[in-house]
């Protein structure tokens, strides 16, 4: 089985020689580097682990740093184990030329997240009457329980289709046809759509449902395709830069908020220390003044006693 990790660049449309228009998804699959081979004797299963998108070591967490230090290789943003793939040694590179025009592949990726959605959008339920006298919410999903009560209890069955989180799940699109390969730019053009947003991770692998071989696809205007690909690459690059800038701005804002919080705590501690110092500096009775006050009090009490005896 053939597999490769790539990055979704975007979608374009192209024309075949017979005039038909087809949708095309551009996937940039940089060389996948083989990191290690899992064996039955050592690991209990057979697999090939690859790395995709080389990054700086400072962007890794401690477990990732430890792993790449252990295998003595460069750091990669994504790592994945390929099952049923053999014939590669550690350090080998898997390129886009493992596929040819006309091959059938499966594309696996995480879909766009839609957040919390209603049952009509999530499960394609029927919309209620939209007239003014409908009498209940127009997009209400209806009853979620069953049972008549009494001896037959009413309850909500497991797996009931209801409102909830929609999207951001692993989806596989089967039987996509490879349109063309551009080895110099590490590009794979696939007929049809692929899940996920721009710059998302995509796994392409040989399809498991269809063994039918399709003739190589011939495009009518390769130059127009090249221009469209270049435009989509630029859009993907700008989107990636905007995402990085937003993340950097968010990190700077958090850093500034922490700094202001530390300054506020430091100022409060200084004010508290100053108040305690002022409290300690207040004048107190000396040792010489204390006996004098005691004598005055004793004289006053003696005079009061004498007045009472008279």
Swiss-Prot record:
Disordered: region residues: 240-310
InterPro entries assigned: Ribosomal_uL3, Ribosomal_uL3_bac/org-type, Ribosomal_uL3_CS, Transl_B-barrel_sf
Superkingdom of source: Bacteria
Coiled-coil regions listed: none
UniProt keyword Metal-binding present: no
Gene3D superfamilies noted in UniProt: 3.30.160.810, Translation factors (2.40.30.10)
Ranges of compositional bias, category Basic and acidic residues: 240-281, 290-310
SUPFAM superfamilies linked: Translation proteins (SSF50447)
Keywords, in A-Z order: Ribonucleoprotein, Ribosomal protein, RNA-binding, rRNA-binding
Keyword Transmembrane helix attached: no
GO biological process terms on file: translation
Assembly: Part of the 50S ribosomal subunit. Forms a cluster with proteins L14 and L19.
Protein name: Large ribosomal subunit protein uL3
Species the sequence originates in: Malacoplasma penetrans (strain HF-2)
Gene that encodes the chain: rplC
